[in-house]
Design a protein with these regions (language model features):
Chain A
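Short secondary-structure junctions
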Residues: 19-32, 75-77, 137-141
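Short edge beta-strands and adjacent turn/loop segments
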Residues: 26-52
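Cys/His-clustered metal-coordination modules, chiefly Zn-binding fingers
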Residues: 98-173
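Short, non-transmembrane amphipathic alpha-helical segments
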Residues: 54-79
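Residue-level signature of catalytic and energy-coupling elements of molecular machines
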Residues: 16, 35, 58, 80
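A short amphipathic beta-strand at an alpha->beta junction
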Residues: 70-94
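N-terminal presequence-like segments and adjacent domain-start helices
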Residues: 1-18
Length: 173, 300
């Protein structure tokens, strides 16, 4: 619905904030941390949104672009540009606190913190990480990694040995 | 349904008519890959060299991705099929960016699709390790991926500071992705190498089989010499010690023996980086380019 009364920048922010991730729809793109900027231009007629991909090959970015265009058109913007930038690379540290809570509520274990990247070579990890990933269903810390690669680019598969439920875990990058 | 409408799932967009906007690489609805692609060529860098170097890094990823995708519906376990497909997808994403950058700087009117699907074999710049394939032998997939990703990770690590903004950005994302690929392969090498007598025998045989293609990974081409001096590229000869030390750590844990086999050599000093390939690349391109060549301009 076009709401001409609210300032364009507020309308644009609100429209962008409501768009959800196509693969993990409990998260908004804001929660996921992929929205890098929303700029209103041309006296409020045009808007430019800048987003960044999670993984290099993640096909969801195309749906995100589509959904952002639709949401901003519905918010009354005549010209919508969605740009993709690669640098700096996305990190799971950019997932918001609300996003982490929503993931857990929907049965997906949120990522642990990564922190700043060290500059040396990435150390070889010959066994699965020992970090405690709590089961999002029963809260037990007794969980195993089944596979590093899950149904989407950003998740791994795990299993809880206490409640025996399998679950996805957003792996840290 | 128009392209501007939202979709219930990522796959709904496949059924739409995208008119002139469709592309091959990922199928329908794919647009310009990133804003950085059109950055100017850094000062003092020959655009032709930069285009060639982007093709080297991009073709390694594209052809390796295609070979990994051959495991889809063929892997021994569903989890491994998903893993190999995920790894292929990461590499395809890296390839798209690098081919788009090559197309932009060469200024010959070729986009990423033209470079991937309409380029003849002699213009491909990938190393043989990417093209030789796995022959549906899972141990061979593990060996090839271990060697390829350990090497690529060391390259990307140094390319983080490349003066070319696209190469640096691809490296920034790629380091995180390829570290996962390497660790996946290293863990399987450990599990098979230090497993049963039969799994050990097959893992060692697979490693021996792909070893002749290792030497080429560290051979420096003229383009790499020029672009290393310009602060854009990495001299692959310089990363050998680091790659060897990672491989030795894996081999020791996995009770595998470092093969003593000669490399495949060159023809008058030329190899994959100069467009001379094994017969395997022809097989890859026949499959990968077949549809695009039989139906020129078709989109889906």
């Amino acid at each position: 619905m076009v709401n001409g009364a609210a300032p364009a920048a507020v309308r644009a922010q609100a429209a962008v904030a409501a768009v959800v991730d196509p693969e993990m729809p409990m998260l908004t793109l804001d929660d996921l941390g992929v929205v890098r900027g929303v700029e209103v231009r041309a006296g409020g007629e045009a808007v430019r949104v800048t987003i960044t991909p999670t993984y290099s090959g993640c096909p969801a970015i195309e749906v995100m672009r589509d959904d952002l265009r639709t949401a901003l058109a519905e918010a009354g913007f005549a010209a919508v540009e969605v740009r993709t930038v690669l640098s700096p690379p996305w990190s799971t540290d950019w997932i918001s606190a609300a996003g982490r809570r929503k993931l857990a509520e929907h049965g997906i274990a949120p990522p642990a913190g990564v922190g700043p990247r060290s500059s040396g070579p990435v150390p070889l990890a010959l066994s699965a990480p020992v970090d405690v990933v709590r089961c999002p269903h029963c809260g037990s810390a007794a969980t195993d990694e089944l596979s590093r690669f899950g149904p989407t680019a950003c998740t791994a598969l795990r299993r809880c040995t206490a409640c025996r439920e399998p679950f996805e875990h957003v792996k840290e990058i | 349904m128009s392209a501007s409408e939202s979709h219930d799932t990522a796959y709904d967009s496949l059924t739409e008519d995208h008119g002139a906007d469709g592309q091959w690489a990922f199928g329908t609805g794919i647009e310009d890959v990133a804003a950085e692609i059109t950055s100017p060529v850094p000062d003092g860098v020959d655009p032709a060299d930069l285009a060639q170097y982007c093709l080297m890094l991009g073709d390694d990823a594209l052809i390796c991705s295609h070979r990994l995708s051959e495991w889809t519906t063929n892997a021994p376990e569903l989890e491994e099929e998903v893993a190999l497909a995920n790894i292929a997808l990461d590499l395809l994403g890296q390839a798209r960016l690098l081919l788009a950058r090559a197309g932009h700087v060469e200024q010959a009117g070729r986009d990423e699709d033209a470079l991937a699907y309409l380029r003849p074999e002699l213009e491909f710049r990938n190393v043989a390790m990417a093209e030789i394939g796995d022959e549906l032998d899972f141990a061979r997939a593990v060996a090839r991926l271990l060697l390829f990703s350990t090497w690529r990770l060391a390259l990307l690590q140094r390319l983080l500071t490349s003066r070319d903004p696209v190469i640096a950005a691809v490296a920034g994302k790629g380091v995180k992705e390829v570290a996962y690929h390497r660790d996946y392969a290293a863990r399987w090498a450990l599990r098979l190498g230090d497993g049963t007598a039969e799994s050990h025998r097959r893992m060692q045989a697979a490693l021996d089989g792909v070893w002749p293609y290792v030497e080429e990974l560290f051979r420096t081409s003229e383009v790499e010499v020029a672009l290393t001096a310009a602060g854009v590229a990495v001299d692959p000869a310089q990363i050998r010690a680091e790659v060897d030390s990672v491989l030795d750590e894996v081999f020791a844990a996995a009770t595998l023996t470092r093969p003593q086999r000669p490399g495949i050599g060159t023809i008058a000093g030329r190899g994959g980086r100069q467009g001379l390939h094994t017969e395997k690349l022809g097989h890859v391109l026949a499959v990968m380019q077949g549809l695009a060549r039989q139906h020129p301009g078709a989109t889906w």
